């Protein structure tokens, strides 16, 4: 039984789904998808549970959420292994994901009070109050690259605000979704408050098509995000929060420490096997001998990156991609870029047929035109050379996406210029593009999405503001507006 609906584990009535380790092929999880009828049941359960959950005090909801945080801590090793085995990422990185899940809970609690709590200001004849109310029933779509951490960034603030939820993990990470749901079960959530439906496209379409949804919170690809936006167009009564991908630029200016700059670039482009939405996809490198030296060093160090299994010792920097198909898509993208005129500096290689272990690739695209503006979700870095900083910014902004952007430079003035001109929601200076702070917004503009699903800013879209003018008594004003007559004289 792999679906959690209204406080019970039930068997899906849809197609059988089998999840394998993307490197070893070992079967990790299997179960049936939720069909449309079961998705509807989950929605009705969430709707029935909403009034009581929303009427609980914030403190009562907080108790359950903090209990979940404690369960994450006590089950950290087990959940780390599940995420690592299912995604292919090394154990060390999966452990940081679980830690991030834990840390964001305390931040989400604080964010609720600071950003969406209650405020009151006194007026001469009463008071003006601001309160926040939950939307109702929300659907949460989770991605596969961080199957615990990223859905957690929606679920925790949504529950704290008083919403009830239908959670659909990525069809590529059902085991992680299952494991997290069982911890929520132990945390003592009332039936119907959080429901789990497993499945792929058909389940997702049934979920997003529900008329009784009050909103949808999504993290994933731009293509799917666009489909959801079209599907919910003309429905302003539903909140839609989209965090999508990026075709992210990293600009390398003059650098004193080449190895430090290479390290930052590798962290930006190849961590998580290039499967972070903030990963650098486009590298802009200043022309000249220093740029040549940097590029040669980047290729040399990247060539030493050997993907390994989740439990290899010593631990590898990167593991496998989410699937062999995903790895092959990166190879195909590289081949297409080469055919368009790109100059390969480091060819990506599948280490073994039938696995998702893929080495990083680097290809120079200077002077090549007509390139597609698409995110290649994997360890493939494209390189352009530029002559001046204004040109670098123009090239960096030449994308429909706007998630992250970075600059490596000793000059604060250039960073200030980038801050003014960059089209990105995250702009870093001498820091990896993949770094983020839970107290800062996480998200972008354009094809990268709309709202900001971080622990701090997610509170904004999980509740709506209610303004009130209040007085504990009613009296006739001493001064009336023109034309009003409350005298005792009888008008004839």
UniProtKB/Swiss-Prot annotation:
Protein EC: 1.2.1.71
Residues annotated as catalytic: 243, 277
UniProt keyword Nucleotide-binding present: no
Pfam families documented for this protein: Aldedh (PF00171)
Positions with a binding annotation for NAD(+): 220-225
GO BP: arginine catabolic process to glutamate; arginine catabolic process to succinate
Matches recorded under PROSITE patterns: ALDEHYDE_DEHYDR_CYS (PS00070), ALDEHYDE_DEHYDR_GLU (PS00687)
Catalysis: reaction(s): N-succinyl-L-glutamate 5-semialdehyde + NAD(+) + H2O = N-succinyl-L-glutamate + NADH + 2 H(+)
Pathway assigned to this chain's UniProt record: Amino-acid degradation; L-arginine degradation via AST pathway; L-glutamate and succinate from L-arginine: step 4/5
GO molecular function terms listed in the Swiss-Prot or TrEMBL record: aldehyde dehydrogenase [NAD(P)+] activity; succinylglutamate-semialdehyde dehydrogenase activity
EC class of the enzyme, as a word: oxidoreductase
Family, per entry: Belongs to the aldehyde dehydrogenase family. AstD subfamily.
Function: Catalyzes the NAD-dependent reduction of succinylglutamate semialdehyde into succinylglutamate.
NCBIfam families: arg_catab_astD, PRK09457.1
Protein name: N-succinylglutamate 5-semialdehyde dehydrogenase
Annotated source species: Escherichia coli O45:K1 (strain S88 / ExPEC)
Phylogenetic placement of the source organism: Bacteria, Pseudomonadati, Pseudomonadota, Gammaproteobacteria, Enterobacterales
């Amino acid at each position: 039984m792999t679906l959690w609906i209204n406080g019970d584990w039930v068997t899906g009535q849809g197609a059988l789904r089998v999840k394998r380790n993307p490197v070893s092929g070992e079967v990790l999880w299997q179960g049936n998808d939720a069909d449309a009828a079961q998705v509807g049941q989950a929605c009705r359960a969430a709707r029935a549970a909403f009034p009581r959950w929303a009427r609980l005090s914030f403190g009562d909801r907080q108790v359950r959420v903090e209990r979940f945080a404690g369960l994450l801590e006590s089950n950290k090793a087990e959940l780390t292994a599940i995420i690592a085995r299912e995604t292919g990422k090394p154990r060390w990185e999966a452990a940081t994901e679980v830690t991030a899940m834990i840390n964001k809970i305390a931040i989400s609690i604080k964010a609720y009070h600071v950003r969406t709590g209650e405020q009151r200001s006194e007026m001469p004849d009463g008071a003006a109050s601001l309160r926040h109310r939950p939307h109702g029933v929300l659907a949460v779509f989770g991605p596969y690259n961080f199957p615990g951490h990223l859905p957690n960034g929606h679920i925790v603030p949504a529950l704290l605000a008083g919403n009830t939820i239908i959670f659909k993990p990525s069809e590529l990470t059902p085991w992680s979704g299952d494991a997290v749901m069982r911890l929520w079960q132990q945390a003592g959530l009332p039936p119907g408050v959080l429901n789990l439906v497993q499945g792929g496209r058909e389940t997702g379409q049934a979920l997003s098509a529900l008329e009784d949804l009050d909103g949808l919170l999504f993290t994933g690809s731009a293509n799917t995000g666009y489909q959801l936006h079209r599907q919910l167009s003309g429905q302003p009564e539903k909140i839609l929060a989209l965090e999508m991908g990026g075709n992210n630029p990293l600009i390398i200016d003059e650098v004193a420490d080449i190895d430090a700059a290479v390290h930052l670039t590798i962290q930006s482009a190849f961590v998580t096997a290039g499967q972070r939405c903030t990963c650098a996809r486009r590298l802009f490198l200043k022309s000249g001998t220093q740029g040549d030296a940097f590029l040669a060093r980047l290729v040399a160090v990247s060539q030493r990156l050997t993907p390994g299994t989740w439990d290899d010792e010593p631990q590898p920097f990167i593991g496998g991609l989410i699937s062999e198909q995903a790895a092959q898509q990166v190879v195909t993208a590289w081949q297409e870029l080469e055919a368009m005129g790109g100059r390969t500096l480091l060819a990506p290689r599948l280490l073994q047929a039938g696995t998702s272990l893929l080495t990083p690739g680097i290809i120079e695209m200077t002077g090549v035109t007509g390139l597609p503006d698409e995110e290649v979700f994997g360890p493939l870095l494209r390189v352009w050379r530029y002559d001046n900083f204004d040109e670098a910014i123009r090239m960096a902004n030449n994308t429909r996406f706007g998630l992250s952007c970075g600059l490596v430079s000793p000059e604060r003035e250039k960073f200030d210029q980038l801050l003014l001109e960059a089209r990105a929601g995250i702009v870093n200076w001498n820091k990896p593009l993949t770094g983020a702070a839970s107290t800062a917004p996480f998200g972008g503009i354009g094809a990268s999405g709309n709202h900001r699903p971080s622990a701090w800013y997610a509170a904004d879209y999980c509740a709506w503001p209610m303004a009130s003018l209040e007085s504990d008594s009613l009296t006739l004003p001493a001064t009336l507006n023109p034309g009003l007559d409350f005298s005792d004289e009888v008008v004839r």
